[in-house]
């Protein structure tokens, strides 16, 4: 029988399956151009190994996966997933380009994300860290080792073992480390003081930390401690933070989102504590000591709000292509949904001459 904490952690880990199913859907429906060739590897790995994760059986894992991956996603969900993926990819690639590949990416709660593999195809020298719960990291590691293309991209000769039961899965190491790729099976809540837990981390190179709907599952205190951990480990060198997460806006739609999350056993404490861009900016500046903050919501990124300076996130030609894939009649509905998700960039550095100039390639609501 699972403890209350184990049950809660299982629910949080399950959100990675939600994200993967959304990525799978937009990939299948041709939103991604070029398509993501690695999504299927993560899906197949979950199909093999979810049954061995805490709280699952062969039957319950099969039901969970069938419900997520066989049901058609609504166009409004596909559009939001596309905008999220596209915007984050653009910032990450611009960061890598500006620092000419001599940089480091840290993806918190990376789970089934495939961004690292895409980046290695064109930026072989970037250092990439992925951190997630040990179980999630194991599923990802096994996906990597079962595909020779991904093995070559990350730089490992290790091959996949034979795992046929929970005991073998439980005893299997979640860690994978190469010269440029580091997969860490770590609960973020255990990162409290800078130490040797982050194998391969290089504090001397510019670093971008990504939290894509991850820190929002922590309490406000845990959120702040996690942010402070990374600013301390930066050792006064340049570190940028790219954060994507929901916010309540203290309105009726936000209340509906809260009830929906609670019905799934999820409690996003920062969702209402920092309900809008202004309160989040204050929290990140005053409690997390970030500077040069840029904040926007996904409605703005998607072009559902009027921009004054023309620095659009997605050009008209690309949006024209996307609009032809699936029709969305209720423009007000998607605008309202996207307003409740924010994208934030901030930086921590003691080096006054170093910053990420490319972040102003795009227009932001608040800076």
UniProtKB/Swiss-Prot annotation:
Q: Which reaction does it catalyse?
A: [phosphatase 2A protein]-C-terminal L-leucine + S-adenosyl-L-methionine = [phosphatase 2A protein]-C-terminal L-leucine methyl ester + S-adenosyl-L-homocysteine
Q: A GO molecular function for this record?
A: protein C-terminal leucine carboxyl O-methyltransferase activity
Q: Which UniProt keywords apply?
A: Methyltransferase, S-adenosyl-L-methionine, Transferase
Cited Pfam families = LCM (PF04072)
Q: What class of enzyme is it?
A: transferase
Q: Which family would the database say this protein is a member of?
A: Belongs to the methyltransferase superfamily. LCMT family.
What does it do?
A: Methylates the carboxyl group of the C-terminal leucine residue of protein phosphatase 2A catalytic subunits to form alpha-leucine ester residues.
UniProt-recorded name of the protein: Leucine carboxyl methyltransferase 1
Organism, per UniProt?
Candida albicans (strain SC5314 / ATCC MYA-2876) (Yeast)
* Gene designation per UniProt: PPM1
């Amino acid at each position: 029988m699972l403890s209350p904490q184990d049950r809660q952690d299982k629910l949080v880990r399950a959100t990675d399956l939600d994200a993967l199913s959304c990525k799978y859907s937009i990939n299948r429906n041709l939103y991604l151009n070029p398509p993501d060739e690695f999504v299927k590897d993560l899906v197949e790995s979950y199909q093999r190994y979810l049954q061995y994760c805490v709280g699952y059986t062969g039957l319950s894992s099969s039901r969970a996966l069938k419900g997520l991956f066989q049901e058609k996603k609504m166009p409004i969900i596909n559009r939001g997933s596309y905008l999220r993926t596209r915007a984050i990819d653009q910032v990450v690639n611009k960061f890598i380009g500006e620092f000419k590949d001599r940089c480091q990416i840290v993806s918190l709660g990376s789970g089934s994300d495939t961004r690292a593999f895409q980046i290695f195809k064109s930026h072989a020298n970037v250092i990439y860290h992925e951190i997630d719960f040990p179980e999630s990291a194991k599923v990802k590691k096994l996906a990597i080792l079962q595909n020779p293309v991904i093995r070559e991209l990350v730089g490992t000769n290790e091959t996949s073992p034979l795992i046929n039961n929970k005991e073998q899965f439980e005893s299997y190491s979640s860690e994978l480390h190469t010269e440029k790729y580091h997969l860490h099976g770590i609960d973020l809540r255990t990162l409290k003081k800078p130490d040797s837990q982050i194998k391969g981390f290089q504090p001397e190179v510019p670093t971008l930390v990504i939290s894509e709907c991850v820190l929002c599952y922590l309490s406000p205190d845990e959120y702040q401690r996690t942010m402070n951990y990374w600013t301390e480990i930066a050792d006064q060198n340049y570190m940028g933070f790219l954060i994507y997460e929901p916010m309540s806006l203290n309105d009726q739609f936000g209340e509906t989102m809260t009830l929906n999350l609670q019905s799934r056993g999820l409690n996003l404490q920062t969702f209402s504590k920092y309900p809008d861009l202004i309160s989040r900016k204050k929290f990140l500046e005053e409690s997390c000591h970030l500077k040069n903050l840029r904040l926007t919501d996904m409605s703005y990124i998607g072009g559902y709000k009027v921009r004054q300076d023309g620095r659009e996130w997605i050009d008209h030609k690309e949006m024209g292509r996307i609009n032809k894939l699936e029709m969305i009649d209720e423009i007000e509905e998607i605008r309202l949904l996207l307003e409740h998700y924010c994208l934030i960039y901030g930086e921590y550095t003691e080096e006054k001459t170093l910053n990420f100039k490319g972040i102003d390639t795009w227009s932001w609501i608040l800076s």
